[in-house]
Amino acid sequence: MLTASICTIGDEILIGQVLDTNSYNIAQELSKIGVKINYKSAIGDTLDEIISELEKCIKKSDVVIVTGGLGPTKDDITKVALKQLSNSNGYKYSEEQAAIIKRILTTRGIAITDINRDQALVPENCQVIEN
């Protein structure tokens, strides 16, 4: 049976400012298709902490799902950690992610900025799953 870890990243999760519904929904959907969730965690926005926790998840599970820490603010450093962990040489611009970001922001009446465009940069050897 395929196993999965779910790691939620964000200080706002830890302090209760934002309710973590992502890991709940991800766990439900993975369970429906026969994936065993063998580890879930929530951590803050610290690079060393993210890297350490993701290394733990990689050792525990076949698949690691990461949610959070991918927004447009300076403390959103998940992709920096993923780049380091995956030994990636750099980032690639994802047209698919750019379209998703544009759709979400346009629907909310928010202007797209350079910071939002940077959200479409993903580590070369990571796969992004829309939530």
Roles of regions detected by a PLM:
Residues 1-40:
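Glycine-rich phosphate/diphosphate-binding loop of Rossmann-like nucleotide-binding domains
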Residues 11-12, 69-72:
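Short glycine-rich anion-binding loops that position phosphate/pyrophosphate groups of nucleotides
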Residues 39-49:
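Short beta->alpha junction loops
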Residues 61:
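An anion/phosphate-binding loop that grips the pyrophosphate of nucleotide cofactors and donors
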Residues 76-131:
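Proline/glycine-rich low-complexity loops and linkers
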